[in-house]
């Protein structure tokens, strides 16, 4: 996938493995941490939980039973809001065909280039209370966007490598103009100077509140 080319996740996973961090003993290999799923139950002050930020819950190798456990926790700890972000919205849609999306679960998909705009339609087809797009890393102009049913859009460039593909300000501005026109909340990703130029004070008004 285009946005995965210089992703920080594999680099960080291997670094944490070298640092002997228990959760990363397998490096970048897919590992299910069942013992971590109940952590939100011990935090009683409500917050936003980014579920599996260094992975994809809807990866083909993640069993539905593991997703069921995650959904169980979201219901047991309804004082938190949980964000599920995927590059595989078709698998997300298939999963929720036979399951109700809890009101405190936000569903999102990554749209880093125009060729992936089809994911928006798939996300829109899922019955959920809150849906968002992550246009990060933004690798090109997305053109015209239909944001019907979308509640939030995050915009950011690639980060973490010397050979990062730069995001052009006009690409971010195109998204901001359309979110403003369609009444959709949008913000830039933390530390992205190009996006900050476009979004100014709107930077991370939502994302800064994450707990995990």
Predicted regions and their residues:
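Conserved Radical SAM active-site core
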Residues: 1, 5-105, 113-117, 142-143, ...
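Auxiliary Fe-S-binding modules of radical SAM enzymes
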Residues: 16, 128, 139, 143-212
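A general structural detector for well-ordered alpha-helical segments in enzyme core domains, enriched
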Residues: 66-70, 119-123, 171-175
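Histidine- and/or cysteine-centered catalytic micro-motif in compact active-site loops
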Residues: 87-89, 110-112, 136-138, 158, ...
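Acidic, His- and aromatic-enriched active-site or binding-groove loops in soluble protein domains
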Residues: 104-112, 206-212
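Noncatalytic carbohydrate-binding groove/subsite architecture in carbohydrate-active enzymes
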Residues: 104-109, 117-133, 141-144
């Amino acid at each position: 996938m285009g946005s995965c080319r210089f992703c920080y996740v594999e680099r960080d996973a291997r670094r944490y493995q070298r640092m002997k961090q228990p959760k990363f003993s397998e490096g970048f290999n897919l590992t299910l941490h069942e013992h971590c799923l109940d952590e939100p139950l011990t935090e009683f002050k409500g917050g936003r939980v980014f579920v599996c930020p260094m992975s994809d819950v809807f990866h083909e190798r993640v069993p539905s039973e593991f997703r069921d456990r995650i959904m169980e926790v979201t219901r047991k700890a309804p004082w938190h809001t949980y964000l599920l972000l995927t590059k595989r919205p078709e698998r997300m849609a298939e999963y929720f065909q036979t399951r109700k999306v809890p009101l405190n679960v936000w569903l999102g998909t990554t749209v880093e280039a125009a060729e992936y705009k089809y994911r928006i339609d798939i996300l829109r087809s899922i019955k959920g209370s809150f849906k968002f797009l992550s246009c990060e890393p933004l690798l090109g102009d997305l053109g015209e966007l239909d944001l019907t049913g979308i509640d939030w859009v995050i915009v950011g460039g690639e980060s973490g490598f010397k050979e990062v593909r730069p995001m052009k300000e006009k690409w971010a501005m195109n998204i901001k103009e359309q979110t403003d026109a369609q009444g959709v909340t949008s913000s830039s990703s933390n530390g992205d100077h190009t996006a900050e130029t476009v979004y100014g004070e709107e930077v991370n008004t939502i994302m800064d509140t994450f707990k995990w």
